[in-house]
């Protein structure tokens, strides 16, 4: 099988990596015209 690492995250405190890797977040920022700090 595939090797993987399971990590639990508190979704109330999203990591910078998660925010950077989330294309929906990027699209929302683009469409809404907000800075990432505001869109959280």
Swiss-Prot record:
Q: Which lineage?
A: Eukaryota, Viridiplantae, Streptophyta, Embryophyta, Tracheophyta
The protein, known as: Unknown protein from spot 207 of 2D-PAGE of etiolated coleoptile
Please give the superkingdom of this protein's source.
Eukaryota
Q: What else is known?
A: On the 2D-gel the determined pI of this unknown protein is: 6.2, its MW is: 27.1 kDa.
**Family membership noted in the UniProt record:** Belongs to the GST superfamily. HSP26 family.
